[in-house]
């Protein structure tokens, strides 16, 4: 194992983050998507592939049908996923997987069969010498320098609140919220339509995602912000589309991410992220709640909105017992903190005995993943 640096691959619903253990940021960050030509005939004779991965698929999005093999944080299309991993090794990192240990990440409460399938593909298709599967939220907590806390991890496909005590996730208290970046993008498309701007295709949706990432923010006081927006143009701002047209966006800027706190905006009967975190803490032993409230760690791209930590603090303070000290931590690198945690973990000397080796896999089969990764 020692002679080659381990690889860390964080497979998110929206983006794949990959790189080398011990480095402080991923080398490759690309969309977790596969594009297939809409019409076979157009592409004839251009030496075209039957499938494009990542950025290349994104750049040809006008003539491709785009599909994401990871839905709500969980791999649903294994053939496409294998293509993404192949692309990661050979095109993005330019390494031979048979020479490197690979640390993969998984969603909390990932079905057992899924971890087994990941293990099988790594050893049998890619012939890796060693691998490990770690829970995303736990890695984010490590990256923040903690071993106890509650992580609100919200990416493109799913959000989770994961209480962690002394390095171990507490499965009975993990809550999943099927509301994340992709839903916010959809909602922004919908409310921009009310303004008369129409975005329909998968290509136009990527434009809306960009608007969301660049211009949206979370209001500290939603009602107050709505009132302010109706009385003045203080929140109005403009965005230039790829064709040069300029659109104006106003209260949509904070109405869009407000869905995280009020899922009923999109017709979802679910608790908002603040209430989900509160409920998660409530499922934990009373003796550790204080440690969780004082270490609420945000992670994932959908927690990148300006104002989220302040709003989260306000909402949790209103729900928690009065004497409780609440601290919400929003590390600046939280978009990549899962990957960073994986980079830290896989380069620790104490971790080297934790790898599942190819020999162990030969002996025990894919069930070994449940014994060695928890």
Swiss-Prot record:
This is Actin-1. Belongs to the actin family. The gene is ACT1. It is found in: Cytoplasm, Cytoskeleton. InterPro entries: Actin, Actin/actin-like_CS, ATPase_NBD. It comes from the Eukaryota. Actins are highly conserved proteins that are involved in various types of cell motility and are ubiquitously expressed in all eukaryotic cells. Its EC number is 3.6.4.-. Pfam families: Actin. Its main location: cytoplasm. Keywords: ATP-binding, Cytoplasm, Cytoskeleton, Hydrolase, Nucleotide-binding. One of its GO terms (molecular function) is hydrolase activity. It comes from Naegleria pringsheimi. It catalyses: ATP + H2O = ADP + phosphate + H(+). GO terms for cellular component: cytoplasm; cytoskeleton. CDD domains: ASKHA_NBD_actin.
